[in-house]
Structure formats: C-alpha cells, structure tokens
Amino acid sequence: GAPQIRWRQPRWPGPASDFAVATWLPVFVEGCRVTMEPQRMIAIEGTKQIIQAHDYYTILPLIPQLVPHLRAALNTSNPPAVAAALEIVSLLLTEFYGAVDVLLECDGFRRLLPTPNTLSNCTVKVRVGYRTKIVGGEQKRLDVIIHETLSLMAEKGGVRGLRLIKSYVPTFDPGR
C-alpha cells in the first residue's frame, strides 16, 4: 500500500480569536507555490484550516491580500502549484457566500484567469487534497481541476463572472 501519515484531529493550540489571521493566512497561501512535501501539505492544509476556523467577517477583508499570492502560484505554470492555488480559490468560493463579490470588486477574477487559460488543456496528473491521508494526496488531472474551478467561479459569479471568464478563457464551456 501507499505510505500513510498519522493524523491527529485538527485543533488550534488556543482560542481561534488569539490567532493573527491577517498575518498568517497570506503566508500560508504564499506557501502553496512550494512543490516539495511536507512543506506543500503544511501550506495547503494550514490555509484550509485557517479559512475553515474563522468566520466571514475575518476572511473576506483578507481576500484582496491573498490574490497576489494566488496569482504568483498560478504564474509559475507549475501544475502542482496551479492546482494548489485553484483549490484555495474553490475553498474560498464554497466557504463564504460573499467571496465572489470581493474577488470581482478587487479585480481578482481578471488577475487569476490568464494561467488557467494557458493550462486548460494540460492533462498532467497532480496530487491534490490530503483527505485520503495518503502522502502527497490523491491524483487528479490539471485540466479537470481547472474546469471545476472555472465552473464554480462562473456559477458563483453569475453573468458578470461568466463574461469575465469567457473573455480570458474563450474555450470554457460551463455545461461541459
């Protein structure tokens, strides 16, 4: 079988209110560019836990600060880094109702879309997610990850979001 990691139940060492989210969340998001394990896992899982442990009012004002780090990860054109950045974008959009509005207002869609356009036909398998508790995560094709994230962005962004996506990724079909 595949090597596995022993997992503990995630919990903060103290109350979540004592954690400096504005300081640490951008650091963890910036770490999604890293492709070596276990640093990659720590960056991705740390980002997810911070986002899930805090509320709407704490995370939404930080989204404009996260966009440059996500864009830097996407601009590496390194499939694992691109997959990690898209996974974080998907998490933000699914966890918080107003995240898409913040992304549209801070021009996040426009800044995040050029790389998915260039890699939309990339069939490289990348390791994503650590829910399976297998070292490195489960494998998924990058083009599938890109399509799922763009579909979520189109669904949450409405007509304006779909129009922006179609302007940067002309081959995108949300019904596919």
Predicted features and spans:
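Positions within the helices of HEAT/ARM-like alpha-solenoid repeats
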Residues: 38-40, 80-82, 138, 142
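Acidic, Ser/Thr- and Gly/Pro-rich intrinsically disordered linkers and low-complexity segments
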Residues: 120-142
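Core helices of alpha-solenoid repeat scaffolds
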Residues: 17-28, 56-70, 101-117, 162-166
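Alpha-solenoid helical repeat architecture
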Residues: 32-35, 74-77, 120, 135
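Short amphipathic alpha-helical segments embedded in low-complexity Lys/Glu-rich regions
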Residues: 47, 133, 163-171
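N-terminal "cap/leader" segments of large eukaryotic alpha-helical scaffolds
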Residues: 1-42, 166-176
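Short, flexible/disordered secondary-structure transition segments
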Residues: 39, 57-58, 81, 99-103, ...
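Hydrophobic residues within the alpha-helices of tandem HEAT/HEAT-like
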Residues: 28, 46-54, 66-74, 81-99, ...
